[in-house]
């Protein structure tokens, strides 16, 4: 049994139940089931079979989910893409791309153009269920990592991992009863794709919005009780709510992951949207690692929640040996349902995974992150965490957003430069003095106003782009 079998079950047992709710339409489970069977016929006619790896680039979320589900049911490996990823560098050889755009996609194999009639093909309702993947440990799905500090990695997942991720993800959502999940992360991300399946595979509704105002209106209109988002989504929703205060009384829980939640944002979200916030930490390779209610986290900067019982985690020092509780070092994790970097091979799923974070684990299992190893700023006699400085700037008067980066110098060391989005004039010296008062090591060389702080789909700052903006005339 797999998640598509559950979708097909609900298509039969509760066909009128709302499966997907969009700003302009509602799709029932019955329609999802019919769509999957129809698309299976179209996929076979396109001469795609389990020997192929297929990229999926479809903007319409409903169609995207249906096509991926049909491929999965047929035992065909898929990877969701935006169309700009360099898959070959990540170790992925794609045989074809199913796209709703009639344009060339270099290195993506042959183009299979998605047509409207894919969803209206005749099929044999009595046909035997497809055999699917050859076994539960075979490669079934590829997810691209965020690539915030390096090139995106292609993470391979077996059918067993895909199914178990859905189950473990559900276990993080037990703080409140819910039936309608609004899922804001994109489906090309592990967070977005997994969250949508955690709703649909259990017979719940997945609600998708195109903007912050859409999200607020749809929560109110459809009685959404669970919101899945990253901090950037919540930032825009709070800003929109400030202009258009749409009540959201049905919201019972907000799950936030993908990036650290700025301390100044917490009271705004709790006052305007929902008081109960579940904070989570995960990675594309490992899945959920830690989670906890905001009340246990908000007073501990950098805390991400308590380690999940299905996770082995250690903090290691420079000698790669575990350090005592509450001592900072590099994080490594290992889970039963771990994906693997395709360039390393399937055996990598059995080894420790190093997500690139610096942090500590308390005696009671609270995971606290200081920052990213790759983002640490080399000041010569010490390393500075840009994330800690950004947390201090959260809520600074007049600042909308801020990004701290290390700017390389001829000496081999780095200077601290800051890009900010602001309302009104910015007093550069005041910001420098504010940070220096917080920490005498935080000696900022430059503060520059930017029109945008570039973030990826998970809300994480793309620091390479920030450096380019700061160096631009």
PLM feature spans:
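Conserved AMP-binding/adenylation subdomain of ANL enzymes
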Residues: 163-180, 188-226, 240
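Conserved beta-loop-beta connector loops within the AMP-binding
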Residues: 300, 314-333, 360-364, 424-428, ...
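Conserved AMP-binding A3 loop
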Residues: 28-30, 140-167
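Gly/Ser/Thr-rich phosphate-binding loop
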Residues: 225-228, 240-300, 312
